[in-house]
């Protein structure tokens, strides 16, 4: 809750929504994700997420975004982009907070295939748009090191 409250967003919109799923509901979520893809996902991969302690569902309120688009029409095209950017910042903040607590996590994107089923399972309002799923739990292993790259290709410093 603290992390969600602290992450900024454009126009102080507070469009981000978080649902944290534990226990049998967490298991059901991952079984439903597997079923939604009709065997196209590796069962072992889905079971690795299911083995976690829980899952954070990241969403944003499209009604909030629509209201801002109407109120500030000059920026209308930007509000969905800004909602996703704010959601990304929230995802990183939650992931970092979990890591500080020595809890492992990964970020998954099985939407839009699972969107409607997730809303049904957890009584999520229809105007909420699912963005990502973050299963979390014990740290099984450290992530593989990232490939070396020429960071100068991605970062420019102008003086």
Regions found by a protein language model. Give the residues of each.
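Short, surface-exposed loop/helix-turn segments at secondary-structure junctions
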Residues: 32-37, 70-79, 122
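Beta-hairpin (beta-strand-turn-beta-strand) motif
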Residues: 23, 59-63
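Acidic, glycine-rich active-site loops and adjacent beta-strand->loop/helix elements
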Residues: 62, 111-115, 140
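Small-aliphatic-rich amphipathic alpha-helix that forms the alpha element of a beta-alpha
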Residues: 4, 72-119
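N-terminal amphipathic, basic helical "cap/leader" segment at the start of enzyme domains
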Residues: 1-55, 158-159
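C-terminal helix-cap and adjacent tail motif
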Residues: 130-159
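Active-site-flanking beta-strand signature of metal-NTP-handling nucleotidyl enzymes
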Residues: 55-59, 134
């Amino acid at each position: 809750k603290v992390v969600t409250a602290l992450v900024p967003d454009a126009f102080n919109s507070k469009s981000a929504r978080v649902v944290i799923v534990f226990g049998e509901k967490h298991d059901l979520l991952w079984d439903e994700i597997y079923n939604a893809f009709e065997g196209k996902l590796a069962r072992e991969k889905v079971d690795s997420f299911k083995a976690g302690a829980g899952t954070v569902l990241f969403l944003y309120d499209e009604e909030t975004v629509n209201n801002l688009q109407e109120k500030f029409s000059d920026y209308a095209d930007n509000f969905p982009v800004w909602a996703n950017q704010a959601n990304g910042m929230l995802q990183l903040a939650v992931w970092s907070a979990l890591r500080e607590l020595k809890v492992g996590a990964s970020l998954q994107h099985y939407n839009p295939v699972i969107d409607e089923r997730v809303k049904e399972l957890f009584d999520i309002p229809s105007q909420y748009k699912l963005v990502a799923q973050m299963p979390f739990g014990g740290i099984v292993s450290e992530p593989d090191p990232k490939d070396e790259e020429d960071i100068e290709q991605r970062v420019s410093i102008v003086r």
